[in-house]
Each structure stands twice: as structure tokens, then as C-alpha cells.
Amino acid sequence: IGIAEALGAAGKGVIQIISDLVDFDQEFALAKAMGERSGRPVSMSVAQAKGRPEQWRRTLDAMSQATAEGIVMRGQVGARAVGLLMGHQGTLNPFMHCEAYKAIAHLPLAERVEALRRDEVRAAILDNIIVDKESPIIGSRLVTKWHIMYPLGDPPDYEPDASTSLAAIAERTGADPAVLAYDLLLERNGTAMIYVPTVNFADGNLDSVREQLLHDAAVPGLSDGGAHVGTICDVSFPTTLMQWWGRDR
């Protein structure tokens, strides 16, 4: 509250809050009080979380009510799901914890791809896939969650159907999903990627995103193209907003 009051004394600026709102009533009340005491608008990041798939609606509705009371609150919402990118050019891939992969991970991409195409390297990696549950790397525990992993494609498909997940393809074809991932990531000379939608994809589609964008308390935002660029790159959210929502979907 003290920080908010100082911003109010300055007479300009926006209070930006990022919170999971685990204790919704208490945390939202604090955010609202910051806006009320400062007289400044409040912006909060809002998205559909898998564990609480309807809370985004409650949050935006509460913001609308606060604004009607004279406390301006807006929810920043994304233009699509926030997703992890896996590939040989990024931080994550399904084989990153394998000793055989670690042995070649330092190589330039072209040399690494050449090594990955050797039968002995392929066998050494695919026979020893592990997940390091102690790894501090964001997203590293998801590298073999085949049911939520999709070929990103070119052009990218940011609303993939469940039938196109690596797990679903493996079930239909009788293939090993790890083998599918291995071959996929070698496409386009090792630049192909796997997409793992997390936030805003609890229903397996982007219907909730559409509702968020149309809500009177929402403003489009949340494009992350810097701090996590090796894992998450959502800098194209504005393009998605204009091209995909405005024209294609």
C-alpha cells in the first residue's frame, strides 16, 4: 500500500501486479486497495491456469466491478497459449538429460545434427531417456510429456488438436513417441521445434482466449520475447492478435 501511495503522490504511472491469486479474496482485495489508495490504474496479468481453469473469468469480472466503483483495473491477457518451445536451438528438448546427448550438446548445430544422425548416437540416446527432476531449468520436467507435445510446424499451429500430439500419433501408428520426437527435431536441418502449450490451453483450444480478449476489463499484452527466449518466445503475440484473430480464426 505504501508503494502504491507513493505512486499516487507522483501523479502518474500504472501499478502492475503479477499474481497467481491462490488466495483470491485476500490478494485481489490488496490489489484493489492499492488502486483505491493511489488513485492510479492497476494492471494484472490474467490467463487460464490448468489447475483453476475458470478463475480468469472471476478475475476479469471482479476488475469490471472495481472499475464501476471508480477504481480502474485492467487484466493483461495473451493472444494465444503461453507455450514452451523444444528443439536443438533452444534450452529444452526431450533428450537434454541423456548423457549421450550432453556429450554432443556443446557442438554447433550443424555438427550436432550430423552426430544425431549417426546410428550409434541415436541408439545411445533413445535407449537412455531420463528426466532430471532436480533440474532447475524451467520446463525441464515436461520434456517427455508426450500428450501435450505437438509439432510446431511451419507455419506454426498455435491451436493444435489433441489428435496431433506426439502421444496420439504414436498410439495411431504404433511408434515410440521418443522416436517421433527424435526424427521431428532433425527436420529442417535440426531447426524444427516441438510446441508445449501450457497456460491458456486447459480446454485444448483457444476459446477461453477469445473470451478474455473480448472482456471489457481486458487489454491485450503479455508478450515475452526476452528473459526466457530460449524456452518461451511470445514476442509475436501482436501478430497473432491482428492476423490470426482479426483475419484467420
Task: Show the residue positions of the predicted features.
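Active-site neighborhoods of metal-dependent hydrolases
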Residues: 1-8, 13-249
